[in-house]
Amino acid sequence: MPALAFVDTPIDTFSSIFTPSSVSTAVVDGSCHWSPSLSSSLYRIDGWGAPYFAANSSGNISVRPHGSNTLPHQDIDLMKVVKKVTDPSGLGLQLPLIVRFPDVLKNRLECLQSAFDYAIQSQGYDSHYQGVYPVKCNQDRFIIEDIVEFGSGFRFGLEAGSKPEILLAMSCLCKGNPEAFLVCNGFKDSEYISLALFGRKLELNTVIVLEQEEELDLVIDLSQKMNVRPVIGLRAKLRTKHSGHFGSTSGEKGKFGLTTVQILRVVRKLSQVGMLDCLQLLHFHIGSQIPSTALLSDGVAEAAQLYCELVRLGAHMKVIDIGGGLGIDYDGSKSGESDLSVAYSLEEYAAAVVASVRFVCDQKSVKHPVICSESGRAIVSHHSVLIFEAVSAGQQHETPTDHQFMLEGYSEEVRGDYENLYGAAMRGDRESCLLYVDQLKQRCVEGFKEGSLGIEQLAGVDGLCEWVIKAIGASDPVLTYHVNLSVFTSIPDFWGIDQLFPIVPIHKLDQRPAARGILSDLTCDSDGKINKFIGGESSLPLHEMDNNGCSGGRYYLGMFLGGAYEEALGGVHNLFGGPSVVRVLQSDGPHGFAVTRAVMGQSSADVLRAMQHEPELMFQTLKHRAEEPRNNNNKACGDKGNDKLVVASCLAKSFNNMPYLSMETSTNALTAAVNNLGVYYCDEAAAGGGGKGKDENWSYFG
């Protein structure tokens, strides 16, 4: 029987007998026969990314801020943006990072409006489209302010579903178009309804949409007390629904809305109190991510019939609010076969809506209503990109010299298993090799638990078995890439509802990815990983990393199409807070962009404070403890005063920094100031953004 030494000839025999196809010890030449266009196809960028994202000739992701109207010199290299804002000599912001592109947001609004304008004009529809943005999708102040500003020319409004949301919507719309709708949805109490009625006193175009029949009595009573004539809408439960995850809010058993019986009671009560003229809007919602225009047309036609019936009953109807449902193509397939895809364009969606409403209204000789939609996902998803870094990867392959442990002191049973394994290897019998590997490992684990084997012996067997498995091509080729991110904070929908988003390296796209991997986050939670990807993949093509990162450099990944809901839903699991945020406009500068706003992510103090801790008191407690005289065996002499300063500085830095891994040490003054002030503004007017500069105290151009 051969000697039981890991560095003996059997290992060389194994590797010469079996030629592993899935594991190669050679480094793949990533530049050979590879191009950005091949990466674009591999990651489906041309599918989900068009017309806003593309792989450029440098192998980086480019952002096309004006969509299909973007000129070649207006492309923004995403990698250059990341380098600018993370450079210690610049802003020195820490990852993870959200990059917002207001130009993309503006283009999405304009494309949505243009799609409906074209459908209305081409079909001879005798009214107009007037959309609203549901603030629940992303309540960020600057996003909402941008939407109100960008949409002012076509009366674009807001939708609110809670008291804080109606407060922010009212405040923002004071600077918007006075005809813009403020649609008030959600469950309501007297305070909520009073706020909505107060909005009408402020000459805001506020509509109170009844979600429950009981809300009507409050509206009647409070409007009379406040001497305000309300505009009332009602949400109907349609029979039409779709079968996907997001269809659960529709249909007769949906969470929201009124049945036909309840609608008739509302109409009768309004008529009795002389307020039937106040009923002017019908709202419904089939569900988010409507997969096809066929389903959309069915739902809109049903709602249009109900709209016409309300007109017949004497209501002064003016608006049909089709709710959300305008989907985006997360996987780029345009198939509509899952919640990740929709089988239509903006133009096809608008055409289907207009045609359905027009057909029913013409049949009933009813005046065409204003069409409103609440298309939040379609508006904000594209404009925001989450950037994070892979900090390490699981070892792809090991060599025999990685486990040079002498295998001595084993039982006869273990030696027998080894002899069987050796014989199977010499015969080239892969199936038997796997069987004997399992037997050998199990027997050694039992010996370790009983105390008859030491850790060195167990490690030697583990290394031997792992090498054999790789040599016969039976090992799992998928690596684990550890990323500086919290899935629960930044991608909560992946954990919560298995929502998938495109994830792509934002650079090195001119090099062939030589590995496949899953992503594991920083949290101490087994669910903190991403192991499902678009296209039905359970791993992602990635570039190899060594101990110094990706080929000696840093490796950046981007999650795209996550501008809706992810920030609003993110928590602070393990006390990992929100990422840093920058706002980037296309400009005529040398790099084609200007950073117009930067916000450092939540510090450790911020997330502690959110959980009712007092960071200032915690700092003083720890500092005081460090200053107390203590008896210890450390006889080393040192400057005690300087030690106290070092401790205080270390504590302050830990409280003020983000909880994520810090990959670079930065003493940048801007970083320190951001930690203290939380936000910077720059002169957006100088960047072509038309912003007001009186409160803005810095500029940072690419």
UniProtKB/Swiss-Prot annotation:
Among NCBIfam families, the record links this protein to: PRK05354.1 (NF003763), speA (TIGR01273)
Q: Per its Swiss-Prot or TrEMBL entry, what cofactor is needed?
A: pyridoxal 5'-phosphate; Mg(2+)
Listed under GO biological process in this entry are: arginine catabolic process; polyamine biosynthetic process; putrescine biosynthetic process; response to cold; response to oxidative stress; response to salt stress; spermidine biosynthetic process
Could you tell me what induces this protein? Induced by freezing. Induced by the bacterial pathogen Pseudomonas viridiflava.
What is the protein name for this chain? Arginine decarboxylase 1, chloroplastic
Catalytic residues as annotated in Swiss-Prot or TrEMBL: 524
**Site-annotated residues for Stacks against the aromatic ring of pyridoxal phosphate and stabilizes reaction intermediates:** 285
Subunit arrangement? Homodimer. Only the dimer is catalytically active, as the active sites are constructed of residues from both monomers. May form a head-to-tail homodimer. Homodimer and heterodimer with ADC2.
Show the InterPro entries listed in the entry. Answer: Ala_racemase/Decarboxylase_C (IPR009006), Arg_decrbxlase (IPR002985), De-COase2_CS (IPR022657), De-COase2_N (IPR022644), De-COase2_pyr-phos_BS (IPR022653), Orn/DAP/Arg_de-COase (IPR000183), PLP-binding_barrel (IPR029066)
GO MF, any single term? protein homodimerization activity
